Regions:
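Single conserved hydrophobic/aromatic residue that forms the stacking wall/gate
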Residues: 1-13
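Domain-level detector for secreted/extracellular nuclease and nuclease-toxin modules, and
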Residues: 14-291
Length: 291
């Protein structure tokens, strides 16, 4: 009976050994499968943790940086060029290549003219055209050369031709009558011209300036010519250097008469010009700059 028992035991041992091998094989397969599943699950989790850390580091860096009050940041360009009217007036806003004009068809004058002059633009070589023509975009009656003939007044540029040398089109448009006002010859050729030259110097020094200028008209104004072009009593000009720190702004006021005094004689606060014109210039500027 002993051999029979030994044979049976041997068979059992073999089966157990095979089962153990099969179990180990399955265990290894299950282990590999589990590892793969774990890796697949961990990849997006780890990536999410990475993104969170990056975001946290960025926020930490920003919190350690000097804080800038964005509400005090001053917009540039045409946002600053357009004054805010504080009283109703007849106007048509016309945007030309080199300047923007608020044209008043009743007065046959601009209410105001504004433009930005950059350092690069002062280097222009375009020649002066001297051809005064009607603004094709202006609606209503507009002045003509005949209105100024023997009137005793110059056709005074608001946006100067010398500031438009950077473009043939800008130069041509600077001679539109919508950009002209009747000016005393010794204002146009002296004080007003001297200020235009000084502003070009500022544009070069400060990289750019924004200029707004125009006439000041009383209710009962003298007129010239068949088209009854109003003759201003005064002229204003406000200038802003928006890219210097601190920003600078200055105002000038001229009577429409001979102007031969030094330029500083005509300096006034921008606030005082705003009261005269019923307009708000550089509306986003702090009051201390305008004063």
């Amino acid at each position: 009976s002993t051999p029979l028992y030994s044979s049976a035991a041997s068979d059992v041992y073999k089966r157990q050994n095979q089962n153990r091998k099969l179990f180990k094989k399955k265990s290894r397969s299950n282990y590999k499968l589990g590892c793969i599943i774990t890796i697949v699950i961990l990849i997006p989790v780890l990536y999410g943790v990475y993104l969170y850390c990056q975001q946290f580091n960025t926020q930490t860096q920003k919190s350690n940086e000097p804080q800038v009050n964005t509400s005090s940041q001053i917009p540039s360009g045409r946002n600053l060029e357009i004054p805010v009217s504080l009283a109703p007036k007849q106007e048509q806003i016309i945007r030309h290549t080199g300047y923007t004009v608020s044209y008043n068809k009743d007065l046959k004058l601009p209410n105001w003219v504004s433009y930005e002059l950059t350092r690069q633009e002062t280097k222009g070589k375009e020649k002066r055209s001297n051809r005064f023509i009607a603004d094709p975009l202006a609606i209503g009656t507009i002045a003509t050369n005949a209105d100024y003939t023997r009137s005793g007044y110059d056709k005074g540029h608001m946006a100067p031709a010398a500031d438009m040398k950077w473009s043939p089109k800008a130069m041509k448009e600077s001679f539109y009558f919508s950009n002209m006002c009747p000016q005393h010859p010794q204002l146009n050729r002296r004080g007003w011209k001297n200020l235009e030259e000084k502003i070009r110097d500022w544009a070069i020094a400060d990289s750019a300036v924004i200029v707004i200028c125009g006439p000041i008209i009383e209710r009962e104004s003298k007129t010239i010519g068949k088209n009854k072009v109003a003759v201003p009593q005064q002229f204003f000009k406000v200038v802003l250097s928006p890219f210097v720190k601190p920003m600078r702004a200055i105002g000038f006021l001229f009577n429409n008469e001979q102007a031969t005094d030094p330029l500083h004689s005509y300096v006034v606060t921008i606030d005082s010009i705003e009261r005269l014109t019923h307009m708000d210039f550089f509306a986003t500027l702090p009051d201390e700059i305008e004063n």
